[in-house]
């Protein structure tokens, strides 16, 4: 199972998301199950390296959010129109 590290987002909105992307990070959301949705941010290089593996989309991913592991599945990926960049990911809890 793949493991990706994440941190909880303290700021939300267009400006905060743009600042994340300039810092080579991007926003994501974890939803589903009996818990509230969590807004997180991920390191772009770490995710791109994992994304090229087939189990990223086919299997569950171990998402470590501020030290707490959560089993999730990739539900949706949004990409930049012409740059090879991910702009947002939706994760669904197992």
UniProtKB/Swiss-Prot annotation:
Name of the protein in question: Large ribosomal subunit protein bL25
Keyword Nucleus: no
Similarity annotation: Belongs to the bacterial ribosomal protein bL25 family.
Subunit structure: Part of the 50S ribosomal subunit; part of the 5S rRNA/L5/L18/L25 subcomplex. Contacts the 5S rRNA. Binds to the 5S rRNA independently of L5 and L18.
A Gene Ontology biological process term: translation
Gene Ontology cellular-component terms listed: cytosolic large ribosomal subunit
PANTHER family: RIBOSOMAL PROTEIN L25/GLN-TRNA SYNTHETASE, ANTI-CODON-BINDING DOMAIN-CONTAINING PROTEIN, RIBOSOMAL PROTEIN L25_GLN-TRNA SYNTHETASE, ANTI-CODON-BINDING DOMAIN-CONTAINING PROTEIN
Role of this protein: This is one of the proteins that binds to the 5S RNA in the ribosome where it forms part of the central protuberance.
GO MF terms, alphabetically ordered: 5S rRNA binding; structural constituent of ribosome
Any single Pfam family the record assigns to this protein: Ribosomal_L25p
Keyword terms: Ribonucleoprotein, Ribosomal protein, RNA-binding, rRNA-binding
InterPro entries (alphabetical): Rbsml_bL25/Gln-tRNA_synth_N (IPR020056), Ribosomal_bL25/Gln-tRNA_synth (IPR011035), Ribosomal_bL25_short (IPR020055), Ribosomal_L25_dom (IPR029751), Ribosomal_uL5_bac-type (IPR020930)
Signal peptide segment: none
Keyword Nuclease: no
Domain of life: Bacteria
HAMAP family in alphabetical order: Ribosomal_bL25
Name of the coding gene: rplY
């Amino acid at each position: 199972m793949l493991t990706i590290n994440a941190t909880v987002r303290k700021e939300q909105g267009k400006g905060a998301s743009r600042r994340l992307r300039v810092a080579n990070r991007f926003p994501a959301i974890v939803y589903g199950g009996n818990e509230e949705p969590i807004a997180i941010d991920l390191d772009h290089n770490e995710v791109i390296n994992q994304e090229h593996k087939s189990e990223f989309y086919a299997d569950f991913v171990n998402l470590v959010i501020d030290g707490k592991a959560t089993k999730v599945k990739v539900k949706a990926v949004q990409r930049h129109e012409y740059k090879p960049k991910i702009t947002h990911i939706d994760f669904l809890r197992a």
